[in-house]
A protein has these predicted regions:
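Histidine/acidic residue-rich metal-binding segments in metalloenzymes
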Residues: 134-301
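His/Asp/Glu-enriched, well-ordered alpha-helical/loop segment
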Residues: 198-226, 273, 294-301, 306-381
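C-terminal cap of metal-dependent C-N hydrolases
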Residues: 8, 315, 372-425
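A glycine-rich helix N-cap at a beta->alpha junction
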Residues: 110-125
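Metal-associated gating/positioning segment near the N- to mid-region
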Residues: 50-112
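Histidine-rich, glycine-flanked metal-binding segment
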Residues: 1-55
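Divalent metal-binding segments
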Residues: 62-71, 90-102, 122-134, 149-160, ...
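Divalent metal-coordination and catalytic microenvironments
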Residues: 8, 23, 28, 49, ...
Length: 425
């Protein structure tokens, strides 16, 4: 059956269109965009008062599948994605076994056929994330990987990283770099600063991120190949990326809503749900990241969706790093950046829908006739309080718990079919 979205406010930065319009979907593709479309036989959704954008692409998630499915799996992760208007994700390789071979890639893609989002695997740079033996990038790309990364760990050896960047480029993939000097981290669990000192816990100096970010930029510039910097959180890394991009280095980067909304002051609660990697930084860093979003230094907003079971998050100092984010990313971005006048809806769509797909060279991200019908429909003005118990993710470790966010996903369309309706599990 055809699907007709009536009276919505359509925002499509890929085409530049913004305004009231109807969208008619036939099979899995957009057939027509215009005013007063009539399709009596179609399933009709009244989108009056709602905003219609391309489905969001989150290019940085952890679905824990295979190997840690007590935290999340591809199906529950897909449910969380659909509830957040996310129709495509890139899942990181720190699974068990690692995504370092075609067999694991095939397992993920086969299971993802039943998920309520499109799942694109990211292969690992080195075997088992060990940092020593490089994977076969041609094999991974042929199997279905869209990028490579040792995310969760840095590639410590600069020679291996340089070789990986070149080989990935010629294999048709980007390297996504987790920028962290583990020797500087040295067991730290939160940002090094006044709060960590007052709490008496070991801090992570911002240099741990800045040094490796600068290394990756230098390699990209010298080798004349691309690099994508994951989850940027510090003011200095932001400035280094900005400067490099202006001088023509092929560097792109991403950040997550918690890095432009929250600070390490929240760690005073000694609640491990505010611990992630990289850690929450200072108000000055939040301002710098926000400026990077505004001036287009930052290309993408992602979540780094990292589920952990409640018992694993119980002990503040021993808990693993990571927070879930798929169901809050759009609302958090609307709250912090759109409703405060810092960015437009066009810019939001570019950050969350267009650029991630461009960087990964995957389809979607626009609402033109002929395009795949992956669509997010939301009420930009509806306020709601984040209740972890109501999240669709298997894990509930959200750093936005108890916060009031403005903007709520009402429907998600995947491949021409409604896969999520607000209020209906």
């Amino acid at each position: 059956m055809d699907l007709l979205l009536k009276n919505g406010y359509v925002v499509d930065s890929a085409s530049g269109f913004e305004g009231k319009a109807d969208i008619l979907i036939h099979d899995n593709r957009i057939r027509e965009v215009g005013e007063d479309i009539s399709a009596p036989e179609a399933q009709t959704v009244d989108c009056a008062g709602l905003t219609v954008i391309p489905g969001i692409c989150d290019m940085h998630v952890h679905f824990r599948d295979p190997g840690q499915t007590h935290k999340e799996d591809i199906i529950t992760g897909g449910n969380a994605a659909a509830a957040g208007g996310v129709t495509a994700v890139a899942c990181m390789p720190n699974t068990n076994p690692t995504i370092d071979n075609a067999e694991t890639v095939h397992y993920i893609l086969e299971k993802a056929k039943e998920a309520k989002t499109r799942v694109y695997p990211v292969g690992s740079i080195t075997k088992g994330l060990g940092g020593a033996e490089m994977c076969d990038f041609e094999e991974l790309h042929k199997a279905g990987c869209v990028a490579v990364s040792d995310d969760g760990r840095p590639v410590k050896n600069a020679r291996i990283m340089a070789e990986a960047m070149v080989k990935a480029h010629y294999a048709g993939m980007k390297v996504i770099s987790h920028c962290e000097d583990l020797d500087i981290v040295n067991g730290g669990i939160m940002n090094y600063g006044e709060v960590s000192k007052e709490l008496g816990v070991k801090g992570i100096h911002r240099l741990s991120e800045d040094i490796i970010t600068e290394r990756e930029i230098t390699l990209a510039a010298d080798l004349e190949v691309p690099i994508h910097i994951a989850h940027v959180s510090t003011a200095q890394s932001m400035q280094n990326i900005r400067t490099a991009a202006r001088f023509g280095t092929m560097v792109t980067c991403e950040t997550a809503p918690h890095y432009f909304m929250l600070t390490d002051e929240l760690l005073r609660s000694r609640d491990a749900d505010y611990r992630m990697n990289p850690p929450l930084r200072t108000a000055a860093d939040v301002q710098a990241i926000t400026e990077g979003v505004i001036d287009s230094t930052i290309d993408c907003i992602i979540t780094d969706h990292a589920p952990h079971a409640p018992e694993e998050k119980a002990d503040f100092e021993k808990a693993p790093n990571g927070v879930v984010g798929l169901e809050t990313s759009l609302a958090a971005t609307l709250t912090a950046l759109y409703h405060t006048g810092k960015i437009s809806l066009q810019r939001l769509v570019t950050l969350m829908c267009v650029n991630p797909r461009r960087i990964l060279s995957i389809p979607g991200g626009s609402l033109r006739p002929g395009d795949i019908a992956d669509i997010c429909i939301f009420d930009p003005n509806e306020e709601w309080v984040v209740d972890p118990a109501k999240l669709h993710s298997k894990s509930k470790n959200t750093c936005f718990k108890g916060m009031t966010l403005k903007g709520r996903v009402k429907y998600t369309v995947l491949d021409g079919k409604i896969v999520y309706t607000d209020g209906i599990d």
